[in-house]
């Protein structure tokens, strides 16, 4: 069925009103009686051993209720089962400037901040490692004693025969690419409110409730249980409105556990909200990545082999690191047909904040390198960049060389649409000097086929309940974080049930009320929670259909649910009036199964609250019993009949990816497989000022294969948002470090593009209709981002003839490349570029809550190792 009532229609988000009017409540808006404020003391050193912590002076300050330190919750945790290397508050060591040392709980924020100054910490300063390739050489003073050479994890995969593939190649290109660290820059800072039920007789802490701006309520509940040594059933996690996540809230952040520990110790509700600067220090963004890439092609453009060595600067803790490094290798496949791949990946520890998941998790940096190199190879063999991509398309359904199953594949159409809309054939290489076009492609998963927590449980479960008045309530654990997942689930349920969207209410992400969903990340919600919603709605629809069929004296398969009416698909109402409305036996207009409601019908079939539906229901039902079976019923009437026959109207649906979508058996095979993949192609038009090095993006044509667009306006918004975020990483965004200090910990210095700098984006929806997606839908919110960066890089080459292999493409880097071209020498990636030199960076490293000033805050070299014993931790 493709004649949808709600699916495929542009629909406003169901939570739009509360967000646009300011009536919506985010975590930091919440307050409880007797609530206290928590503030965190951070490490001033990148690497040091904690010899002693004394919070007694802080505890004596009026207004201070508690001081919390690492020994108050010594159990380690981590988002991955293989990476339990974090403590909410440091126990024996601090591993980066900004690491969490202690927390003060006080009646006001001002008192808490004053108390931080009174905590005495003695440190033994240790050598620190800031560059991942240098860190890999470490033999002593390791960041974690159980990680030799500071390597968190390394993987080595060979698929096919890469040696033969390179031997067969007519042209080979081998380059180093660097993509620097970036962060999410979500509007809402991380915030958590924790409250224990305190037994008034014993004073013991009982049940815990946590409100948090999280993408993963179930994982948060799980980790709180682990650290606090409490049963999960005694922990309730509620997700209020979330002001953006992009991956930055997709794991358990120390703040969330610290708030719970503090609430238990203070025996009162405690709220902790990061300052914007703290968000930057705790960001878990995209890691700096060094990619040594080698690709071989034939003269006909066919790729023969790819070899990638990827080194990621993971920071001080595991975070999502194992998954991140595996994605960077696994998703080299599933975009093009590559017969031979060698991948060597290293996730390396450094004395900087941990990096984690960010929009396009694991794929963006390697895709920048690959799509840039593919253009270089096209130039070597004299082939159009669009054509070389066409020559390497997959032939679905297929299994890639590394075991990824591909069923729906809209990349060919994406390429054709962008080439056509941009005038590629007519304009490429023919624009005015300093202006150019570039093309690139990308793809992404529609959720991971294998769960982080290894189990056989469904990845998503949804419950649907229908009340007597026809109101539909959806209970889902999926987190709405601004991407529109609540609207999506409401649309699917309304489409299946044939009811109006205004009947549907969504209750989401409350672990006491909603069934398990493993979270909003990896673009999994539409595919997985959407399928679960569809199945739950179909289950309850069967109950309604059985009752309606009995009332109408027909078979269940004769019924059609549409426009708030349950009707027979054949019979009196279809005779001679197809496509028209006609009177029923009671004199009212009835819709044809092929028609729509008139305004009069819409009023008659409206939701509860109308006099006829509420006050006169009994007499109307009695009248209809006397008249005999009808050809149609309002949705509300059918629901009442079903409740009379069956009792409560509830349905449950679950989804887990099928076994055939879960990948191969090699080490690390669990990361990369997905039930479906999205595909994108982009053409960017840019201009380059050769005097200043400034790059301006004028327009981006972005085509995205999303399976089926359940809500086109939402899909277009996601495509535009992905392009915008990709442009930021391409041109301006970069976490700048100097000896372990973050030089730009604020929105002004970090420089995300503003609305003024955002280019025109022509979003092009391509619908391949996936056989397993809900109504054919799949991912739409992340896959486009990875194509933007190389499309801009390739456009810069078309404009001024220089290849930029380090992102972002700042004016300094552009000018350095132009000088290298003018002087006829190869570009050194770091020559002439000091990322800390622009005046926008804070030489003092910001105003994070830690002790010590200037260069004495931490060891800048090994010769300055020693012991700090002054209150607050500075010599």
Where are these regions (language model features)?
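C-terminal catalytic domains of large/alpha subunits in multi-subunit enzymes
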Residues: 70-71, 229-234, 263-270, 299, ...
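Glycine-rich loop/linker segments at domain edges
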Residues: 9, 15-18, 149-192, 288-372, ...
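Extended active-site and interfacial segments that coordinate phosphate-rich ligands
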Residues: 14-18, 117-130, 215-217, 222, ...
